[in-house]
UniProtKB/Swiss-Prot annotation:
This is Procollagen galactosyltransferase 1. Beta-galactosyltransferase that transfers beta-galactose to hydroxylysine residues of type I collagen. By acting on collagen glycosylation, facilitates the formation of collagen triple helix. Its EC number is 2.4.1.50. Residues 570-604 are annotated as: Disordered. InterPro entries: Collagen_mod_GT25, Glyco_trans_25, Nucleotide-diphossugar_trans. It catalyses: (5R)-5-hydroxy-L-lysyl-[collagen] + UDP-alpha-D-galactose = (5R)-5-O-(beta-D-galactosyl)-5-hydroxy-L-lysyl-[collagen] + UDP + H(+). Disulfide bonds: none annotated. Keywords: Endoplasmic reticulum, Glycoprotein, Glycosyltransferase, Signal, Transferase. Residues 584-597 have a biased composition (Polar residues). Glycans are attached at residues 78, 166, 363, 561. GO terms for molecular function: procollagen galactosyltransferase activity. GO terms for biological process: positive regulation of collagen fibril organization. A motif (Prevents secretion from ER) lies at residues 601-604.
Amino acid sequence: MHLLCFFFLLLWTGPARSYFPEERWSPESALLAPRVLVALVCRNSAHSLPHVLGAIDRLNYPKDRMAVWVATDHNSDNTTEILREWLVNVQNFYHYVEWRPQDEPSVYEGESGPKHWTNLRYEHVMKLRQAALETAREMWADYFMLVDCDNLLTNRDVLWKLMRENKTIVAPMLESRAAYSNFWCGMTSQGYYKRTPAYMPIRRQERKGCFAVPMVHSTLLLDLRKEASRQLAFFPPHPDYTWAFDDIIIFAFSARMAEVQMYICNRETYGYFPVPLRSQNSLQDEAESFLHSQLEVMVRNPPIEPSVYLSLMPKQTDKMGFDEVFMINLLRRSDRRERMLRTLYEQEIACKIITAVDGKALNASQVEALGIKMLPGYSDPYHGRPLTKGELGCFLSHYNIWNEIVDRGLQSSLVIEDDLRFEVFFKRRLQNLMQEVQSQQLDWDLIYIGRKRMQVERPEKSVPRIHSLVEADYSYWTLGYVISLRGAQKLLRAEPLKKMLPVDEFLPVMYNKHPIEEYMSHFPQRDLRAFSAEPLLIYPTHYTGDQGYISDTETSSVWDNESVLTDWDRARSRKSREQEELSSEAQNTDVLQSPLDSTARDEL
């Protein structure tokens, strides 16, 4: 009996001995995301805020671990209304929202315009940033993120990625249309910007990583868990500060005195921002400069959508004073079509899509039915090959437009292809150019707005009394051009289908600037009046060797023999390369420059 009881006791106690209590516990849960306060200090930012706020909406970070601190003042646009609507609609998503609007006054005392930074403005902005930083400290935030109100954060994981760098002050490198970015690699003994050899390799991402630099600005992340962060301040300036009264320099000095190193990270593309304008620029200039940043995003990325928590009016498109705007697109290149339609819409430009003739789909009987004959003796100048089917389709696409211009009696038309990027202030600069052409009663047939200048040894002749216009010399590409009714008539009158060559070789023949006399001899009437914008208003999205470069003209087959393919080593093709460097003697230095042109070419 005792043995039986002992046996049952073993059975009852055995399982308990085989399990430790901790083995029955669930695994430890993940840590909560660090608490982040995002600060926005905005003025006259109505043009940029819908997209900047949309980018913040889309950050891949739990909203309940984020606080939003927003201040705005001295506005002459509807910045306050936009921010208020957004905050009302998103406030329940965030852990905390602080809103500091100031409706009056709309200008600072002593400022000459909305882009003029007076000492009073610097001081006010620094005080607001300091207030935001103190709020973050009071609520025990782990991180403080400052974002300027025209900075587009396209990388949704930017917060996580900056946190992983484990730096007290770290900034994501932002892209711009120029060499400008949100960091300095050098600083003078007086605190000003200093050019250094280290800058461009980082800016171009030839060197990738997180680099110690003396200055970061615009968008940056502070790790408030670091002990040294307690000594950082946007305002007041450090007692030892004697440099210029400038917000970013004052903060950089604060970091230096706190022995905190600033870092810039360029491991990935994190976002975009516009190049700063001059103090005399207008709000319209600023809006169009920001618009250009949006367009640059779309060259290689999906468009930046505005915040869904804002009610926005649709844009009103127009034809910029032309009778028609033609946009050529291959039906199978839907990605290009969608990008171009969006970029045109953002610029409020209406267009008519012209379905391009697909050279690959042309057969011998179709070519024969059109009466197409090759120009005797033509061969590609770089490969020695005849015309490709892609080049044939390209020519026919432009040829069909010239026919439509004549049939409809269109006095002036803009023709653009689908693989281009627009220069800053594109619409205004083109409209200004055409107004000057009209007011000066220029006798013109065709005006390039995008091309590759092939004559690089001597300057082109500037057009008197017209800003930014030269007489066109030998050029490649038909990215974009303005053409008159008379110009289209001249091109058709030459009967080019009977002596076919690529369209960008045909045009220089028709304005008598082709270097090969034999080609020109087949076209006795070469009186096309051709000019070019200078500087150019559009450029290709990609060049030979670029990631994503696709050529529908070079990568094809010979026009009359599908078995002969033409996909040679495109690295050898000069035709699709970027514009060669012009010699100093060839620079069009006597061309009248408009203020917009000089602004567009600045690289700060």
